Amino acid sequence: MEKVQAQAAELEERVVAINRVTKVVKGGRRFSFAALVVVGNKAGDVGFGSGKAGEVPEAIGKASRSAKKSAKSVALKEGRTIPHEVIGKFGAAKVIMKPAAPGTGVIAGGAVRAVLESVGVKDILTKCVGTRNPHNAVRATIDGLKQLKQQL
């Protein structure tokens, strides 16, 4: 998995999660928003990022910039599925990904689906085990994609 110098225009953004977070100070509570964004060009490049700000659009913008900086390239088989079975892990999250026959579609939940569709995977079977926390699920999916090897 190598780093990508992609044009900003060709990467498509997907907001995976928006969360209101609170900081308790002497005078009361301060609210801000955290966003998790996945970017990809549907041709094997994907990145993710998180951002925090006082307003939702600002948080999404920060997360998007962070995601574009972390964009990496992934090895796909025939441009539609992964070359072999792989297990990605991060924290308590474990994502099992298996290649699928043409026409199967993306069988994945929430955060994992966002990553795989951004990469450009069209046929895959996945199962998220352990925590289904979006941050950990996205990182576990990216970890699994990093392990992919191109078949000769």
Curated annotation (Swiss-Prot):
GO CC annotations on file: small ribosomal subunit
Domain S5 DRBM: 11-74
Keyword RNA-binding attributed: yes
GO biological process: translation
Function: With S4 and S12 plays an important role in translational accuracy. Located at the back of the 30S subunit body where it stabilizes the conformation of the head with respect to the body.
Quaternary structure and partners: Part of the 30S ribosomal subunit. Contacts proteins S4 and S8.
NCBIfam families on file: rpsE_bact
Protein name from the UniProt record: Small ribosomal subunit protein uS5
Organism: Bdellovibrio bacteriovorus (strain ATCC 15356 / DSM 50701 / NCIMB 9529 / HD100)
Lineage start: Bacteria, Pseudomonadati, Bdellovibrionota, Bdellovibrionia, Bdellovibrionales
Gene: rpsE
